[in-house]
Amino acid sequence: MSPKPGSRALGIAASDAADRSQLCGAVVRADRVVDDLVFATCTTGGTDATAACCRLWDRLDRPDVQWILIAGVAPAWFNLVDLDALADHAYRPVVAVSFEASDGLETPLREQFDGAELDHRLDIYRRLPPRTSVSVGDDTVFIRAVGIDTDAAAEVVAAFTPAGSGRPEPLRVARLAARAGRKQWLDEPENTEP
């Protein structure tokens, strides 16, 4: 069953700065109406992305949101999101969406980290559901779904993706707002009024 026009999804995307990454959560309806925005930050190269995503959800306090879409699983330079933990926290299905084919993150993780930092990231990464390619119009995206089967997740992604876009609208809006937030609050904090 495809989402109805008034159905809502929370899209989460990040924009990275040197030390912090700006996350934005955008609530968007399937008919492309933007309903709400919320912001949080996480550490670039840290291990707090899952907690930041949970903060976004808590700040929204939007029981009408039916799905969470997240742009990838490793925002903020390998700050992995535990999709199961986010789904459990929000009591909502979570679908991670990426836009490029990949051989996976295990090799890059091993190149960048060692010891406990590597072990922690590998533990999260290995628990992620498999990545599946999905056709959305003329484009191919890659999804990992928690709390929803792959076919239903593909329907959700397609329903929130405008024709010819290749990117679900909640993620497009969240990415734009995260970038604007990063420029305002992280890149030039001296220009931010108290």
What positions do the PLM features span?
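Amphipathic protein-protein interaction modules
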Residues: I68, S135-D149
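Short glycine-rich or small-residue beta-strand-to-loop segments that form or flank ligand, phosphate
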Residues: G11-A13, Q66-V73, V95-S98
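A glycine-rich, hydrophobic loop/mini-helix early in the fold
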Residues: S21-A76
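Gly/Ser/Thr-rich loops at beta-strand to alpha-helix junctions
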Residues: S15-A18, G72-L80, E100-D103, I148-T150
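Two-metal-ion RNase H-like nuclease active-site motif
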Residues: M1-A18
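Charge-patterned, long linear interaction tracts outside catalytic cores
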Residues: A145-P194
